[in-house]
Amino acid sequence: AAFATLMIPFDLLGGIVLPRRFARKTPRLPRLILSWLRAVLIQSACLTASLWIVLQAGQTIGIAGAIAAVLMIQIGLVATQKWLAILTGGISLESNVADIDAAGPRIATAHHMDSGFTGSIVGLPGAEEVVVPQSWQSRMTPEELDTQLVRRIGAIRTGSRTRGLLLALLVNTGTFGICAVLPNAGVTTVPQLATAALYFTFASFLWLLLLPRISREGVFEADRFAFDNGHSVRQIEATANQIESLHDDEPQRSRRLESIFHPVPCVRRRVAELSLRTRSIHGCWNAARMTLFLSWACGGFLSRAVHCNIGRPELWVILPTD
């Protein structure tokens, strides 16, 4: 409750003031308030339940039990991400009857209000579902939409999405384990666990600076998959530009700024990367932002307090990606 209250002015800035300043479509204020309250209540309930489970495991088994509980809760979050997005963000999903590849993952269309919603890949490995924003179907050409679907299917087939997921699980689980043994932290009392969660939040900020580079390699790998499967550089560039205009609208940025804060590289860098004949680096698709969502299991407070989703409940569970 204290954290939610502290975040109110920042949520107003990120969810209302800045989007309207840059002429982004936003719901009316009463609807925004109701959606924010619903999202805060659901996220708070998830965080509380997660920490309670970790506390019970810590009191019963010890630090190893608490770490195992954190890992299992994260796996549960991955499995239920779609449903949490529906409950928290208020989006609705419609499964597509005719997928572009019968042997590929299921594809669902998301009906949403936030212009920054990009959809993602949800579900456990082997049971993935590609979520596509409804706005893309009305504002992108069929060729651009097909290119983007092929990219996301490529993230699955190359293993990049699974690698990103495993990295996020490893980072959060390992970080929590370290934080739980720091001074005044622990897993057997509420004050100890609260201290561990605070340590974890500070550590998460450091990961925000380190993980984007690995995530960018996943973007490059998905672009390469689309190129190798018949989509030209021009098509991939046009698709990336269209998505950029719909969401971040930041086509040019310094390399230093991008290297720290942006897990999705700018279009210019993506096109330059495609000029390479082969790629030897395997990426971890969406690892940086998946780490934020999965931090719910560890009491992480940064999951809804980063520049891409602050004050925007539709983006708290499915954070923006490429």
Please place each PLM-identified region on the residue numbering.
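Hydrophobic alpha-helical transmembrane segments of polytopic membrane proteins
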Residues: 197, 201-213
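Polar-ligand-bearing catalytic/cofactor-coordination segments
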Residues: 1-188, 210-297, 301-303, 309-322
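Loop-to-helix entry region at the N-terminal start of transmembrane alpha-helices
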Residues: 188-197
